[in-house]
Regions:
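Active-site core segment of subtilase-fold serine proteases
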Residues: 2-74, 78, 197-198
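Mature extracellular/periplasmic domains of secretome proteins
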Residues: 10-14, 92-113, 124-137, 149-162, ...
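Extracellular S/T/G-rich loop segment that most often corresponds to the catalytic His/Ser-adjacent loop
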Residues: 24, 152-220
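Subtilisin-like peptidase catalytic core
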Residues: 53-119, 215
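Gly/Ser-rich catalytic serine loop of serine hydrolases
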Residues: 58-65, 146, 202-213
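Structural detector of well-ordered beta-strand residues that form the stable sheet scaffold
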Residues: 81, 140-142
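Active-site neighborhood of phospho(di)ester-bond hydrolases with catalytic His/Asp-centered motifs
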Residues: 113-115, 142-145
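Conserved small/polar residues in nucleotide/adenosyl-binding loops
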Residues: 222-229
Length: 229
């Protein structure tokens, strides 16, 4: 339907409720009570070379919960659909990522956040194709560029918005350019974010944070009244 150079046009018809999918390490089971928001999800795992969809999407690492915390800090009026593919060591595999994106073809979500990157030997034409299919549906895909790198998968694809965090000297939160390899640069400054019960940590000096922050800002655009309303 559109690539990221047309992203502004996607928001002409705004909606009052937005659902974001987060593909990550899951989410803390107290999150929805902490922030009074709707949370649902699944786990996707590879067992004996076979993809399994499971009900467990509890976060054993904290990374996925921090991602959701950054997003809801930008846009409180939001619904989450969580897909857990990373374990307590933040390890996963490309098969689970592909299966997760395929699952989202049939889910009513507006934005897909991937604060992750695939290893350099993880190029797979199936991943590129599924990102395009989701993009053709009008779903916005956001991915963090691998820390310390200028390109990574899936951020490198033209149907995915590639995000990096930096220490910006200028007096603005982000820079966006559709015709560059890194499409969006977000101001990267650590703040306190919820990770688990009674536990807030300083988080923000990484590209995962930057991708989550952009996702939250776009969610806020979705929920804001349109000038054409």
């Amino acid at each position: 339907m559109f690539e990221h150079e047309d992203i502004t046009m996607a928001f002409i018809k705004k909606m009052r409720k937005v659902t974001i999918a987060i593909i990550d390490s899951g989410i803390d089971n107290r999150f929805k009570n902490q922030f009074k928001c709707k949370v649902s999800g699944i786990g996707v795992t590879l067992i004996n070379n076979e993809i399994k969809i499971v009900e467990d999407y509890f976060d054993e690492n904290g990374h996925g919960t921090l991602t959701a915390s950054v997003i809801i800090n930008e846009c409180p009026d939001i619904e989450f659909f969580i897909i857990k593919i990373l374990d307590r060591k933040l390890e996963g595999n490309i098969e689970c990522l592909i299966a997760s994106l395929e699952y989202l073809l049939d889910k009513d979500v507006n934005i897909i956040n991937m604060s992750l990157a695939v290893e350099k030997n993880g190029r797979d034409s199936r991943l590129k194709k599924i990102c395009k299919r989701l993009n053709d549906q009008g779903k916005i895909l956001i991915a963090a560029v691998e820390n310390g790198s200028k390109k990574s998968i899936p951020a490198i694809y033209s149907t995915v918005i590639a995000v990096e965090g930096r220490k910006l000297k200028q007096n603005f939160d982000f820079m966006f350019s559709s015709n560059k390899r890194i499409n969006c640069v977000i101001r990267s400054e650590p703040h306190l974010y919820y990770q688990k019960k009674d536990d807030y940590v300083m988080y923000g000096d990484c590209n995962s944070f930057a991708a989550a922050k952009l996702s939250g800002k776009l969610c806020l655009l979705y929920t804001s009244p349109s000038p054409r309303d």
